[in-house]
Each structure stands twice: as C-alpha cells, then as structure tokens.
C-alpha cells in the first residue's frame, strides 16, 4: 500500500491535468504494486526553498511496505521517479528531491485494524 506525496512550489495552474492519475499508475509500475492500492496526494503552491533558491522545485515522499527498504531498491525507484517527474513537471533533476520511507504492516491502519491482520 504505497503512499506518494508530491509537494511543490509550482502553482496549481502549472500542475498538468490528470497528474494524480499518471503518478498513481507510474508508482504502481515502479514499485510493482496494484494501482488500486496506491494513495496519491499532490500539494501545489507550497513555500519551498531548495539549494538556497525558491525557483520551482518538488519533494516526492514515498512510503510503502516492503519495496523501499534498501539502497538498491531505491536507486532503481529513484531513477524511474526522476524520469517521470522531470517530464511531467518540466523541472531539472537538481530541483527534485525524493525521500523514501519504509513502513511496517503495523504502521498502516485500514478497515478498523492494521495491515498486519489483513
């Protein structure tokens, strides 16, 4: 159950229509998870400073069980997500940061319990 959060200082008017659906599909492919399990949040218009600059930038936060826990996994994921984001948002790679957060099943609540018991 991946959670993907895109935070950017780009205004909402510069976010391509349907980005949430394409980011969901890309995440499912990249992380090899079912698309109906991916949760996407996009936060445009944020106040962000990166590398001492307020030029357009983005932070991508990816949390998931079992697929973002090693450097080898995340190197591959990072390459794919960077390709997606640079194309979709027209940002250079040095204006994007990705943070990976491995989760345990007991850290996600669903259907009145936690994933451990589902």
Swiss-Prot record:
Tissue-wise expression: In all organs tested, highest levels in liver.
Keyword check for Repressor: no
Gene Ontology biological-process entries: melanin biosynthetic process; negative regulation of macrophage chemotaxis; positive regulation of ERK1 and ERK2 cascade; positive regulation of inflammatory response; positive regulation of tumor necrosis factor production
Predominant subcellular localization, coarse grouping: cytoplasm
GO molecular function ontology, one term from the record: dopachrome isomerase activity
Cellular compartment(s): Cytoplasm
Catalysed reactions, semicolon-separated: D-dopachrome + H(+) = 5,6-dihydroxyindole + CO2
EC number, UniProt record: 4.1.1.84
Subunit structure: Homotrimer.
Family to which the UniProt record says this protein belongs: Belongs to the MIF family.
Name of the molecule in the record: D-dopachrome decarboxylase
